[in-house]
Amino acid sequence: MGKRALLVRGGTLPISSGFGRAHDTTVKRLTSGSVNGWEIIGEVDHPIDDTGAINRLRRRWFSHPSRVQRIANEKTPDLIHITDQEQAHLVPKNSPCPVVVTVHDLFLFDSKKMNTNWGEIEIGNLNPGFFRRIDLRRLKKGLHRANLAICISQATANHLATIMPDLPSIVVPNSVDVENRDPRINLRTRPLLSEDSLHLLVVGSEDRRKAIGFVLEVIGELEDEIRNRIVVHKVGAESNSLAEKRLKERASKLNVNLRWHGKVEEENLIALEQHCDALLFPSAAEGFGFPVVEAMASGCPVLVNDLGAQNEHPPQSSILPAFDKSSWMEAIVKLNEERIARGSSFRTPRVDLLDAASAYSNAIIGHQHQIAYDTVIRSK
């Protein structure tokens, strides 16, 4: 029998959300045996339901933390793993064992305004409400109680070191089921994509930080002949109706063909990744950048801004100067030229990207996961 980990989070977030997706991959690594010498003895979470603001706050601040403490005392695990920093207040004040917290990003802990060539972008929330300010103080205190922070990227680890230099940290990236996405093994049926168009995929919410509006502006400035061949496919579960309306109006004004998919099933997302001509990911800041690695694992060309943490994953040829419109326009023109030269809607999978994505397999990340757990056990 291996050492026993108790996994803890708040609500049971779906895999269509970043935190939910990362929690799911953590569970899969542990249950598949990829984290050698470790097993899950339980998960502590609660349903996401509309119980009213007061009840939700009472559960978040009082009843759920008490439940975590009680279950930890009853099960006596070797380690408690809280799988995202938004639940760091759940670190028990009297823990029977070491506690690690996965830190995805610190945008809400250390919000700022970023000045870019595309204008000012708010990273996080510079004006949280009264209860959120109290909540953030609780989260920071909880994170300070942890024995180790597991950061999902080097960019996040560097950020953590600037605001919590005394908290030990280790980098364990998110893992991806690379075999499931590999088109050489599991090619999905081509979605309904017009045969003679250039299909460009964007994945993310409508938050300005994700910079989907930047993509629309870049494409809108291309020559008519090229722009008219492009279809932008927008996928993202976190939908803001007002922001969605603004982006659609912006696309219409710029004469950009925007196809709004919204939330899609995982199989449909993989099919788009495998058959679109490229993923465009111009985000201003990321804790990791799941869509980039997942597209790479699908053999899909990617273009990203040279900003953390999405620039940690692809080869240099896929990384563009941040918010430099001319560079992005040139890259898209090149994609169009390659599409015309192929003379076919079939795009050969990018083997170099498949190889790069293999570094995020469950087996490789599982070994890093094991090192993190073993490190905190030895240091306790």
Regions found by a protein language model. Give the residues of each.
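Short alpha-helical donor nucleotide-sugar binding micro-motif in glycosyltransferases
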Residues: 143, 271-276
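Nucleotide-activated donor-binding/catalytic signature segment of Leloir-type glycosyltransferases, i.e.
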Residues: 244-267
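Active-site donor-binding segments of glycosyltransferases and PAPS-dependent sulfotransferases
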Residues: 4-91, 251
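Conserved acidic donor-binding segment of nucleotide-sugar-dependent glycosyltransferases
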Residues: 318-343
